[in-house]
Amino acid sequence: MNWLHAIILGIVEGITEFLPVSSTGHLRIVEKLLGYDIQGAGITAFTAIIQVGAIIAAILYFWSDIVRIVVAWCKGLAHKEDRDDPDYTLGWGIILGSIPVGVVGLVFKDAIETTLSSLWVVAIALILWSGVMWLGDRQLGLNRGMKEIGIVDAIVIGCFQALAPLFPGISRSGATISAGLFRKFDRATATRLSFFMGIPALVAAGIYESVSAASDISIAQGGAVAIGWGPTILATVVSLIVAYVSIAWLLKFVSSNKFTGFMWYRVVVGLIIIGLILSNVVTA
């Protein structure tokens, strides 16, 4: 892989990882257009590792929130009188809400990495989930805040999150934000919950995939092109920087805007992918 391709893919990952537009779908189509085999061991390892950059960006951005939630959860475990703290409940919610996606990832690992990685699946999921987001965005009474989250809310959001690895085009953030909206949280809170619910799952998946696939970076081929550690590290750093900016922008955007633009964007991208497949520019 050359340095320019590494920068391009790092930017794509950084921009799309936390937006409700499917980072997996974008990476796969861009990797295809750049000439890589998206089911090749090398490019699969590359994709898993550069996602760690975006995950680190989220941890850095929400570090004070993470520390506050962890401290509240630990205090609640030690002292019953501290269990009324909303952050204690949120801590349990994040733990319980992370279980469904972990189970799905382990049980359906082979299908996720093969059959379900088809660009047809990505394109159709991008388009169809836009309708789900549209319904969620038009819920009445979207006024619940972060302090109102309960265990049931977290489990519902977690179950929605578990759909993302099964159907890559759905987008993990698209699924969790939609769930938050259906639970009547305001858009800003639904988005922040999406980050909090996603961080444990993304960290676990990132570590697992990176460790298990790291050797493929140096010995495997991404299509006809070797990947290499230099471009991989560069892409990871680029994804970290771009993802940090993307997170800040998204939180500011949702504080005063609906998700309509993202919905239409998803439909357009889905149709473009279908067009590229039908015209044999890329293979599914």
Swiss-Prot record:
Name of the protein: Undecaprenyl-diphosphatase
Family designation: Belongs to the UppP family.
Localization terms from the record: Cell membrane
Superkingdom of this protein's organism: Bacteria
Record keyword Metal-binding present: no
Catalytic activities: di-trans,octa-cis-undecaprenyl diphosphate + H2O = di-trans,octa-cis-undecaprenyl phosphate + phosphate + H(+)
UniProtKB keywords: Antibiotic resistance, Cell membrane, Cell shape, Cell wall biogenesis/degradation, Hydrolase, Membrane, Peptidoglycan synthesis, Transmembrane, Transmembrane helix
UniProt GO molecular function: undecaprenyl-diphosphatase activity
Transmembrane regions listed in the UniProt entry: 1-21, 43-63, 88-108, 116-136, 149-169, 193-213, 225-245, 259-279
Pfam families tied to this protein: BacA
Cellular-component GO terms for this entry: plasma membrane
PANTHER family, A to Z: UNDECAPRENYL-DIPHOSPHATASE
Keyword Manganese set for record: no
Protein's membrane topology: Multi-pass membrane protein
More info: Bacitracin is thought to be involved in the inhibition of peptidoglycan synthesis by sequestering undecaprenyl diphosphate, thereby reducing the pool of lipid carrier available.
NCBIfam families recorded: PRK00281.2-1 (NF001392), undec_PP_bacA (TIGR00753)
EC number(s) from the headed UniProt entry: 3.6.1.27
